[in-house]
């Protein structure tokens, strides 16, 4: 293959990599140095980039300097800056030097580790680091790789939930017969992430068989065991087959924590696969004072947390543990002739292709390994505790202002609050909170999001960006107060 100059292309030339790599690292370092100069939420309009880029790809090579100039002028204006210290909209998607270096190393090695033989280190390192994190979380030994359980890295919590739902579905169908699919019933609270709904659609679970159980402020939006028991009993009486329960530790809307032990007891006694989704809050549970929130996980069949949220590991890196790896492999294993090899055929190794939806997989364990080694567990605990401390401070600021109220008790580093309602005018209050959110986000100085709880529009301040300090939290509150004052007096 020749490029425009007649020279044969060498796409991984070591010297060019060294030259361009230095330029790219400098560019990224400068970006982080100046990240506060950008509006946190992109202010562009839909379709903006089509007007700035050509209709077709270049025929001949351009320089990296030209590309980076376009990144500065055309791409960065269309970026919402998730790593900004004033990003409070969603749960964090942490980046770090260690995570970045691990990602770089993974890209540089360029392996595809779908089976042990395709890169033994990729499989074995993944098993080791998932065991490391399981020990930090004090998970039961059944989730460790030395037995029939183990951990695997998925792309997202959505993939993790889909994988275990399919495993649970096939496990019960092997017992009751494949024609019973239309009788299978899934249970969750109305605070469970929409990923479960999508997983049910993919797995062929009829929407009428998805029990979305109502929660309210009396339990801080946690699922009541009584609600689950009543639903399961009704379905059994109707001749249906309860088979899957998804509980939450740190819901997306308000960080509600479901009572795992009580829910697990019901699930276990009825042969229901019990999955615990701790995508966000799982990271905090490496701190002894927050481990209580996953008490009862010993009753679960599977458990997931996102290292790419609050664990300084660049996206994507969702950690899933199961007690019975056979349930996964029986549901997801494929073994065409071109993938057969001695180690796999002899059952001597783990082939992670059979623990996930796709075949191909990146060397994602490298970045998690780098994070654990370059920071250590004690530093990670301090990092998480600092965000929780900042959230406590923000909560106190809100509580001291009579124009605002805290809607749900803060547990981790999310504060749910709103402008207080005018007497008997809840609808007007909701509109006013929407207006406040739009005003704050349009300023470009910070970015927040909202949710709805019991019909109330609630503002969410999720503290967790890697660069966030006390001054950013105080500045955010100052802007919120200023915009609120304008709305209340206009």
Swiss-Prot record:
Checking CDD domains in the record gives: DOPA_deC_like
Which of this chain's residues are annotated to bind L-phenylalanine? 92, 193, 308, 338
List the GO molecular function terms.
3,4-dihydroxyphenylacetaldehyde synthase activity; phenylacetaldehyde synthase activity; pyridoxal phosphate binding
Into which family does the record put it? Belongs to the group II decarboxylase family.
One GO biological process term is: L-phenylalanine catabolic process
Q: Does the keyword Lyase apply?
A: yes
Gene name of the encoded protein: ELI5
Q: Which organism is it from?
A: Arabidopsis thaliana (Mouse-ear cress)
Quaternary state and interactors: Homodimer.
- Result, substituting residue 338 to Y: Abolishes phenylacetaldehyde synthase activity
State the name under which the record lists this protein: Phenylacetaldehyde synthase
- Enzyme Commission code: 4.1.1.109, 4.1.1.107
């Amino acid at each position: 293959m020749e490029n425009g100059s007649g020279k044969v292309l060498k796409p991984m030339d070591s010297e060019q990599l060294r030259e361009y790599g230095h330029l790219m690292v400098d560019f990224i370092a400068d970006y982080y140095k100046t990240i506060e100069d950008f509006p946190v939420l992109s202010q562009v309009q839909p379709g903006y980039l089509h007007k700035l880029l050509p209709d077709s790809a270049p025929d001949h090579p351009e320089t990296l300097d030209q590309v980076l100039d376009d990144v500065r002028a055309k791409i960065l204006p269309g970026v919402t800056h998730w790593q900004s210290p004033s990003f409070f909209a969603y749960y964090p998607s942490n980046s770090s030097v260690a995570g970045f270096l691990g990602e770089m190393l993974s890209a540089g090695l360029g392996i595809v580790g779908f089976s042990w033989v395709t890169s033994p280190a990729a499989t074995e390192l993944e098993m080791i680091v998932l065991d490391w994190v399981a020990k930090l979380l004090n998970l039961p030994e059944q989730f460790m790789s030395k037995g029939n359980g183990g951990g695997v890295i998925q792309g997202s919590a959505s993939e993790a939930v889909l994988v275990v739902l399919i495993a649970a579905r096939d496990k019960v169908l092997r017992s009751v017969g494949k024609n019973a699919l239309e009788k299978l019933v899934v249970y969750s609270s109305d605070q469970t992430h929409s990923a479960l709904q999508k997983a049910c659609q993919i797995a062929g679970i009829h929407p009428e068989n998805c029990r979305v159980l109502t929660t309210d402020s009396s339990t801080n939006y946690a699922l009541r065991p009584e609600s689950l028991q009543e639903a399961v009993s009704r379905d059994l009486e109707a001749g249906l087959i309860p088979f899957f329960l998804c509980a939450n530790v740190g819901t997306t809307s308000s960080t509600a924590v479901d009572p795992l032990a009580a829910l697990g007891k019901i699930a276990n006694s009825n042969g229901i696969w019990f999955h615990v989704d701790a995508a966000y809050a799982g990271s905090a549970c490496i701190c002894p004072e927050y481990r209580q929130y996953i008490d009862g996980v010993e009753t679960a069949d599977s458990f997931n947390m996102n290292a790419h949220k609050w664990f300084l590991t660049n996206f994507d890196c969702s950690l899933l543990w199961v007690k019975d790896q056979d349930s996964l492999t029986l549901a997801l294993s494929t073994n065409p002739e071109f993938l057969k090899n001695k180690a796999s055929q002899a059952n001597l190794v783990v082939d992670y292709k059979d623990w996930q939806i796709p075949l191909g997989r990146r060397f994602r364990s490298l970045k998690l390994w780098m994070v654990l080694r370059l920071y250590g567990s004690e530093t990670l605990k301090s990092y998480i505790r600092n965000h929780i401390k900042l959230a406590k401070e923000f909560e106190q600021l809100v509580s001291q202002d009579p124009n605002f109220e805290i809607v749900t008790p803060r547990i981790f580093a999310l504060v749910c609050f709103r402008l207080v309602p005018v007497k008997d005018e809840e609808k007007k209050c909701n509109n006013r909170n929407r207006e406040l959110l739009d005003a704050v986000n349009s300023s470009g100085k910070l970015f927040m999001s909202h949710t709805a709880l019991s019909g109330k529009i609630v503002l969410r301040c999720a503290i967790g960006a890697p660069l966030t300090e006390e001054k950013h939290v105080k500045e955010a509150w100052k802007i919120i107060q200023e915009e609120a004052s304008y709305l209340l007096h206009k």
